[in-house]
Amino acid sequence: MAKTVAYFYDPDVGNFHYGAGHPMKPHRLALTHSLVLHYGLYKKMIVFKPYQASQHDMCRFHSEDYIDFLQRVSPTNMQGFTKSLNAFNVGDDCPVFPGLFEFCSRYTGASLQGATQLNNKICDIAINWAGGLHHAKKFEASGFCYVNDIVIGILELLKYHPRVLYIDIDIHHGDGVQEAFYLTDRVMTVSFHKYGNYFFPGTGDMYEVGAESGRYYCLNVPLRDGIDDQSYKHLFQPVINQVVDFYQPTCIVLQCGADSLGCDRLGCFNLSIRGHGECVEYVKSFNIPLLVLGGGGYTVRNVARCWTYETSLLVEEAISEELPYSEYFEYFAPDFTLHPDVSTRIENQNSRQYLDQIRQTIFENLKMLNHAPSVQIHDVPADLLTYDRTDEADAEERGPEENYSRPEAPNEFYDGDHDNDKESDVEI
């Protein structure tokens, strides 16, 4: 039975620019949306221009001092915030750029609205590719992430759902989400990520399992360089199957960071777009309300391919291997296909013995769980936002270019000869 899918896209979210040379390029969201439009996938979804999160919304998780700082700081006045910049870890990896707070408001609002719609059973699946910024902490920015939209969305889901499962397939450990829910059994966090050799953020060991009420409700799958589709699937599907069976979540949040693909600018895995998509399709197969978010991904053309393909899986619509012509067509050269070969020469250092050892340890930890922990009956607080369908347009009446513009910032894709988004560095 086909699911009702809500899709959140703000036409301005791709306008923001972290700065020349920075690997995080919000313009990847415009590429993704363009492919979603030109493949006609928008016809299979309810499309929303999302709510913008307020300071109050963000302070559900973050400290007021930190959010107040994000709202006030700008490139023109940052010299007066030297102490705060250091205190809140804003600087090189997490730069101050024009419209910083507005950017955070837009991607966070979309995740929050997706959670609210799932709570109200308006949709079965909610998609926000702009979200998934999993490194942000309560008091500070981290790893290109300022506001943790995932945590804020989960807090909203917890009003209606006794148990929320968080799954993270970004190459980097979902440390901000893990830290937020480390002491509770209301949220179970499962992260598959590269671990070791000082790889960012340096957390996510298999023996980080939670504490107090949350002991054993935190599950980490530390992986080595070069993992491929077969090895990843060998671990992902049995682990997630066991987690769902033991924990019985009533809602799932899936972070789909695309930096776990082969040929990613900051990555070291060997997943194909199909292999990455298999994880999304498998999670969808449990027929549990699902919030799907973006995350990392730094070879922008492949991020767009990946998230477009995964959108097609979520709406159960087959799409052609040949990319449709669009204003961004030239960025998908030389093949102009949906599934280019993104394998690299990185050796798969994840032996079958190593993966079996991880799986055995994880299964032993899962045996320590209480099956489906319960919560006491409580009054449900008011929704953080009031649902309003005024931004919804009928798919058949809405033109594919509605609410869409082509923003372009200097260096939005390539920052000179040393930017390894260029074709000369990576064979795609």
Swiss-Prot record:
Region of interest called Disordered, as start-end residue ranges on this chain: 388-428
Biased composition (Basic and acidic residues): 388-405, 415-428
Compartments in which it is found: Nucleus; Chromosome; Cytoplasm; Cytoplasm, Cytosol
EC number: 3.5.1.98, 3.5.1.-
Effect of R265P: Abolished interaction with NCOR2 and activation of the histone deacetylase activity
This protein's GO CC annotations: chromatin; cytoplasm; cytosol; Golgi apparatus; histone deacetylase complex; mitotic spindle; nucleoplasm; nucleus
Binding site for Zn(2+): D170, H172, D259
Example of a GO biological process term: negative regulation of tumor necrosis factor production
Tissue: Widely expressed.
Any one GO MF annotation of this record: ubiquitin-specific protease binding
Keyword hit for Repressor: yes
Coiled coil: none
Cofactor(s), names only, from the UniProt record: Zn(2+)
Role noted for this protein: Histone deacetylase that catalyzes the deacetylation of lysine residues on the N-terminal part of the core histones (H2A, H2B, H3 and H4), and some other non-histone substrates. Histone deacetylation gives a tag for epigenetic repression and plays an important role in transcriptional regulation, cell cycle progression and developmental events. Histone deacetylases act via the formation of large multiprotein complexes, such as N-Cor repressor complex, which activate the histone deacetylase activity.
Family (UniProt): Belongs to the histone deacetylase family. HD type 1 subfamily.
Assembly: Interacts with HDAC7 and HDAC9. Interacts with DAXX, KDM4A, HDAC10 and DACH1. Found in a complex with NCOR1 and NCOR2. Component of the N-Cor repressor complex, at least composed of NCOR1, NCOR2, HDAC3, TBL1X, TBL1R, CORO2A and GPS2. Interacts with BCOR, MJD2A/JHDM3A, NRIP1, PRDM6 and SRY. Interacts with BTBD14B. Interacts with GLIS2. Interacts (via the DNA-binding domain) with NR2C1; the interaction recruits phosphorylated NR2C1 to PML bodies for sumoylation. Component of the Notch corepressor complex. Interacts with CBFA2T3 and NKAP.
Name assigned to this protein: Histone deacetylase 3
Higher taxonomy: Eukaryota, Metazoa, Chordata, Craniata, Vertebrata
Gene: HDAC3
